[in-house]
Amino acid sequence: MEPIYEEYLANHGTIVKPYYWLSFSLDCSNCPYHIRTGEEARVSLTEFCQIFGFPYGTTFPQTKHLTFYELKTSSGSLVQKGHASSCTGNYIHPESMLFEMNGYLDSAIYNNDSIRHIILYSNNSPCNEANHCCISKMYNFLITYPGITLSIYFSQLYHTEMDFPASAWNREALRSLASLWPRVVLSPISGGIWHSVLHSFISGVSGSHVFQPILTGRALADRHNAYEINAITGVKPYFTDVLLQTKRNPNTKAQEALESYPLNNAFPGQFFQMPSGQLQPNLPPDLRAPVVFVLVPLRDLPPMHMGQNPNKPRNIVRHLNMPQMSFQETKDLGRLPTGRSVEIVEITEQFASSKEADEKKKKKGKK
């Protein structure tokens, strides 16, 4: 295996050029070291909050992509942690870098057969657009290493809205990736997962600050993401958050689930402390309120009203060789096909035949 990356020892881990040909660039502040491992992978709280939409939820469009990762053994022991950042100069997504053939993860697993599980924590769900092919690379990676499982947690869905030109490709690719369940898990970051990311990857956060409660705006966004990914893939995320207010309604399935699952460590009397100098978004007071939450299997929650029926059976596509489509065809994906005249003719003839039969019966009756 001839690697395409270069790795250098740093003070608290390693720094990696995902492609040997990358160099320092004025167009990208992270070039050329887009992958960092160990304690070098930590980022500032300010950067994390801006990119991941924490703790209030996403308040403005985010162009940067950041993915934290953990490599673990079958027993759950941590082998390595790190992060990959997008390259704005060459327009490369972090998932594309990590899962490149002969890339960093390919080499890591090839040289360490104890790695059995990869966990990603990304600000965006992976895409499969032509310039990136992130999901295709993940799919091929999993075929190459059949003993590896992959869990993907994200803070927002990326380019899956129907009015985006490439959304059809992204949604279809997410369905294909989700069809590999239980080897692959696609789920929004929620609840205690936020605390885990803060503890493992964010610098300057420690003690009780790590476990402060998730605010309502963020919790609602996470729950919305859970139902959206379910609508797209047909596979339910295993866990999602339930707000404490749900407990006031004793007639819901969520109430039963609340009583069955213990509360996580949270501090309902505190707000999440933002970095000094960073302004809080102008949100309604209820979206800034702290939330005591429980993690409940999504199957135990009452359904939400959505455009698509999440219980509708789906045909899972297990390949990613998608046909080429023109831009105009992509725009027309949401349009309903026009009716066929043959159907109208059949209905007209049916109606006419029935009318003639009735007239004949009337004439016979007169005779």
UniProtKB/Swiss-Prot annotation:
CMP/dCMP-type deaminase domain boundaries: 61-177
Active site: 95 (proton donor)
Cofactor(s), names only, from the UniProt record: Zn(2+)
GO molecular function, one term: hydrolase activity
Keyword annotations: Hydrolase, Metal-binding, mRNA processing, Zinc
GO terms for biological process, alphabetical: mRNA processing
Binding-site residues, Zn(2+): 93, 127, 134
EC number: 3.5.4.-
InterPro entries for the chain: APOBEC4, CMP_dCMP_dom
Tissue expr: Predominantly expressed in testis.
Functional summary from the UniProt entry: Putative C to U editing enzyme whose physiological substrate is not yet known.
UniProt cross-references to PANTHER family, sorted A to Z: C-U-EDITING ENZYME APOBEC-4-RELATED (PTHR35672:SF1)
The family this protein is said to belong to: Belongs to the cytidine and deoxycytidylate deaminase family.
Name of the protein in its database record: Putative C->U-editing enzyme APOBEC-4
Taxonomic source organism: Homo sapiens (Human)
Gene assigned in the entry: APOBEC4
